[in-house]
């Protein structure tokens, strides 16, 4: 306390902070980026290991030999699904009853806020079919789920056939201690969400559905299966769920263990695992996989049916069969054995998966980065905002500091005069107008879509996207509006106070986002922090304005799409990137209203108004 109360010591501290602030900010930002890039290199990346004792060994004998039966079921399912987009409910009921399951159906309907042009649907109605295999050795207190999504674009026939063949095989075993639910959902994720809401007796997305007539125990784990052919060259696992949630790492370890036992090739993000981590090639390949995971997790989308289970505290994975040009191929029997082994191990669980990590990054299936090792990367970036805020606070408490002299230290003999206060009224206008623009960006595109279609020759989805872009660009005129209301006798102190508030606001937002979804928080911090630190109404304003625009949330999304496709080795042209950007905007809004994805409200109600504050600072008059 003596350091802050003594004027001489406080003046010395102010000199140090003002003199070293810029070098410390640069060093902190570089350290944050370097720390993130180093996550794919040992020792920051560690080998995965099984933490749950009940799943620590693969000493189970898989007996599934129903590959031919699975193919027969798949052919029958495809034959009965003659009408595109229609699920053969009656055939599924008969087939599930024939293998000894309790069979139930659930109808659901959903009117989307605007037409989904990607899947060509607006008024959605469908029927889910599920069968329950009751555990012969216990009461129905716990259960496992094997689910297959069926959408209008792909029938997923082989996955349905394998599900029915596994149900027939499981029915003949007596060692099950948990109920097993075999679920076939209509309309992909919409059917999955409808079933989950009905199973847990809640309604969070507005889907109208019939109540479930049959239930099993509390769901402990779930596996979603997607197969496009009778043979696969590899199984790709997807872990990223809604709003960046991840399943317990032990479930992923279990999948990898049984793939290795059965000789199945398993991939992550479509990438093979690096074999040599001692050379530079292995970590660099792991860095590509890690970046792909970061980009997918940051989107907040449910990248498979498993992503919706995670919201309900159910550990889940989505497995996709890949049939490429590789020489070695595996049939449905091999895939079925891996699934049988996983379910038999999950059957041993005495409690929910909780021993291993829930927050991690994956440079490979056999390597992970824990939360304690990746969070410092974001911490270094947020330190830049804290240092700049401290610098502004000290400048505001020094009398007679001009913007040109902000970086200069005062002479030792200069007394500290009473501080000229900056009234909160001078900051109220830009803060309120910025937040009002965020509210308009959040509400108007969906509310005004019908009005836009009446006056302009556009479809509803196009109207939503164009309204989004129009409101976003209209925010650039914000400084001209706020300056008419701001009346400060000391204009330099006005923009410094506004920037101080904006820096604290941005740091709090990014810190909270990073705790919930590290990937999103890091990407936003890596892009927004430099422009936020440099924004001021003096100096090369054109350069600062260009930097602010390039690092705005919308342009960050645009650039992330190019980076994502580049990492997938499917580069985009500028026209293709723009079209994909418009589609991503529409899907982001749609997934918020349909599934509760939070990326759109975070950007519209939080980061966009904050970005407008820095834009206001830049053009302060």
UniProtKB/Swiss-Prot annotation:
Biological processes annotated in GO: attachment of GPI anchor to protein; GPI anchor biosynthetic process; GPI anchored protein biosynthesis
Bilayer topology: Multi-pass membrane protein
Lumenal membrane side: 42-370, 451-462, 564-597
Annotated TM spans: 20-41, 371-393, 426-450, 463-483, 496-519, 520-536, 541-563, 598-619
Ranges per topology, Cytoplasmic: 1-19, 394-425, 484-495, 537-540, 620-621
Disulfide topology: 259-266
Recorded superkingdom: Eukaryota
UniProt cross-references to InterPro entries, sorted A to Z: Gaa1
Main location: endoplasmic reticulum
Cell compartment(s), UniProt: Endoplasmic reticulum membrane
GO CC term, one of those recorded: plasma membrane
Pathway given in the UniProt record: Glycolipid biosynthesis; glycosylphosphatidylinositol-anchor biosynthesis
Assembly and binders: Heteropentamer. Part of the GPI-anchor transamidase complex, consisting of PIGK, PIGT, PIGS, PIGU and GAA1. Interacts with PIGK.
Record protein name field: GPI-anchor transamidase component GPAA1
Name of the gene this protein is made from: Gpaa1
């Amino acid at each position: 306390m003596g350091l802050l109360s003594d004027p001489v010591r406080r003046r010395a501290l102010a000199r140090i902070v003002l003199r070293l602030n810029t070098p410390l900010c640069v060093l902190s930002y570089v350290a944050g980026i370097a720390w993130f890039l180093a996550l794919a290199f040992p020792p920051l990346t560690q080998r995965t290991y099984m933490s749950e004792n009940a799943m620590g060994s693969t000493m189970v004998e898989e007996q599934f030999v129903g590959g031919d039966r699975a193919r027969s079921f798949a052919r029958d399912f495809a034959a009965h699904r003659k009408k595109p987009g229609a699920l053969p409910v009656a055939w599924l009921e008969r087939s599930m009853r024939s293998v000894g399951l309790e069979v139930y159906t659930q109808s659901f309907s959903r009117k989307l806020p605007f037409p989904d042009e990607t899947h060509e649907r607006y008024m959605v109605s469908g029927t889910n079919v599920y069968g329950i295999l009751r555990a012969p050795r216990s009461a129905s207190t716990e259960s496992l789920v094997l689910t297959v999504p069926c959408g209008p674009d792909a029938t997923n026939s082989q996955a349905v056939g394998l599900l029915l063949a596994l149900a027939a095989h499981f029915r003949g075993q007596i060692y099950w201690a948990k109920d097993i639910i075999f679920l076939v959902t209509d309309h992909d994720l919409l059917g999955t969400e409808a079933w989950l809401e009905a199973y847990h007796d809640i309604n969070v997305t507005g889907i109208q559905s019939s109540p479930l007539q049959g239930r099993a125990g509390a769901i402990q784990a779930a596996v979603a299966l997607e197969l496009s052919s009778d043979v696969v060259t590899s199984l790709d696992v997807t872990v990223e769920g809604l709003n960046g949630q991840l399943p317990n790492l032990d479930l992923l370890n279990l999948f990898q263990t049984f793939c290795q036992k059965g000789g199945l090739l398993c991939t992550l993000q479509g990438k093979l695992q690096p074999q040599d981590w001692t050379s530079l090639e292995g970590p660099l390949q792991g860095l590509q996989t890690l970046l792909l995971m970061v980009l997918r997790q940051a989107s907040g989308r449910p990248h498979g049916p498993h992503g919706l289970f995670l919201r309900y505290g159910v550990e889940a994975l989505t497995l996709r069969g890949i049939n490429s040009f590789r020489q070695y191929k595996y049939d449905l029997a091999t895939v079925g054995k891996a699934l049988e082994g996983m379910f038999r191990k999950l059957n041993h669980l005495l409690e929910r998966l909780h021993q291993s990590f829930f927050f991690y990054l994956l440079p490979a299936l056999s390597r992970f980065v824990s939360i304690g090792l990746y969070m410092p990367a974001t911490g270094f970036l947020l330190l830049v905002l804290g240092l700049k805020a401290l610098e502004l606070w000290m400048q505001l408490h020094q009398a007679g500091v001009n913007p040109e002299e902000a970086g200069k230290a005062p002479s030792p003999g200069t007394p500290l005069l009473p501080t000229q206060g900056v009234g909160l009224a001078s900051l109220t206008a830009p803060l309120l107008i910025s937040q009002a623009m965020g509210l308009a960006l959040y509400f108007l595109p969906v509310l005004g879509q019908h009005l836009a279609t009446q006056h302009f020759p556009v479809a509803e989805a196009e109207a939503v996207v164009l309204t989004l872009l129009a409101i976003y660009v209209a925010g650039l005129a914000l400084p001209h509006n706020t300056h008419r209301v701001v009346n400060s006798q000391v204009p330099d102190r006005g923009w410094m106070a506004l920037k101080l508030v904006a820096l604290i606001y941005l740091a709090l937002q990014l810190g909270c986002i990073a705790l919930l979804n590290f990937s999103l928080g890091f990407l936003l911090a890596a892009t927004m922090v430099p422009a936020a630190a440099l924004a001021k109404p003096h100096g090369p304003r054109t350069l600062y304005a260009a930097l602010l625009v390039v690092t705005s949330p919308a342009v960050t999304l645009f650039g992330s799409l190019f980076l994502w496709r580049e990492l997938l080795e499917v580069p985009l042209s500028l026209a293709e990137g723009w079209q994909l950007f418009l589609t991503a905007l529409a899907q982001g809004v749609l997934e918020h209203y349909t599934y509760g994805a939070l990326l759109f409200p975070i950007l519209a109600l939080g980061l966009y108004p904050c970005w407008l504050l820095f834009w206001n600072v830049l053009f302060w008059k």
